[in-house]
């Protein structure tokens, strides 16, 4: 039954060539370094934030304060939902997940969008059901470009991780430019000595420059959803 409920699909225009840059957990470096790189080109990113992590130090570095989040929202970046407690969506009851998403939304009242990403990339039918109740899109970590018929509750994305290099990311940009689609990138920290889940400023800048050179449109996740659902 849950599979039927969560299978609402959207058909993407084959002419779309769009890129979204997204960041999970809100480490400070993803704002002050990656955010600045995006802004130099007039771009904005989507930041999936968990209120329960604010100002803590995690494996991806120091997490930002509420003040920084408000500042970057005012600068045009999208602040999106990542649950209040950064909980594993796959291991909890759908009702608990809905409550956790709503609690996070309340904490960031007035500045948070209806976009969501699954912490740890953990997603199943129950998690998609919960996400559909209170969000308009949910990004996972299944690799690939979104094209053709897509499930907005399980958006594909491509990771930008230093330990993997960025060749695959650059190849994906070329693929999107040639064959169309919506290419979503995700990472965590962006610093000279990144975690296993982050990348360096040089890698991120090179990727952004490649997107620019291919004349791809860069939008936040919310902006894309508004466009394709019109």
What are the roles of these predicted feature ranges?
Residues 13-19:
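A short, charged/proline- and glycine-enriched loop
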């Amino acid at each position: 039954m849950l599979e039927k409920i969560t299978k609402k699909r959207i058909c993407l225009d084959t002419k779309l060539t769009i890129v979204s840059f997204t960041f999970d957990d809100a480490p400070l470096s993803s704002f002050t370094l990656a955010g600045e790189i995006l802004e130099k080109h007039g771009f904005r990113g989507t930041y999936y934030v968990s209120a329960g992590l604010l100002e803590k130090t995690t494996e991806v570095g120091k997490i930002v304060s509420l003040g920084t989040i408000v500042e970057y929202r005012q600068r045009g970046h999208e602040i999106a939902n990542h649950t209040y407690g950064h909980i594993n969506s796959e291991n909890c009851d759908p009702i608990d997940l809905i409550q956790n998403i709503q609690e996070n939304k309340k904490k960031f009242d007035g500045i948070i969008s209806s976009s969501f990403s699954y912490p740890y990339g953990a997603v199943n039918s129950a998690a998609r059901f919960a996400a559909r109740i209170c969000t308009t899109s949910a990004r996972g970590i299944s690799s690939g470009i979104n094209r053709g018929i897509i499930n907005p509750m399980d958006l594909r994305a491509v990771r930008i991780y230093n330990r993997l290099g960025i060749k695959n990311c650059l190849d994906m940009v070329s693929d999107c430019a040639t064959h169309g689609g919506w290419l979503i990138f995700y990472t965590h920290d962006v610093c000279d000595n990144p975690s296993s889940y982050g990348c360096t400023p040089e890698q991120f800048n090179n990727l952004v420059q490649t997107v620019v050179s291919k004349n791809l449109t860069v939008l936040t996740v919310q902006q894309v959803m508004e466009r394709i659902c019109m």
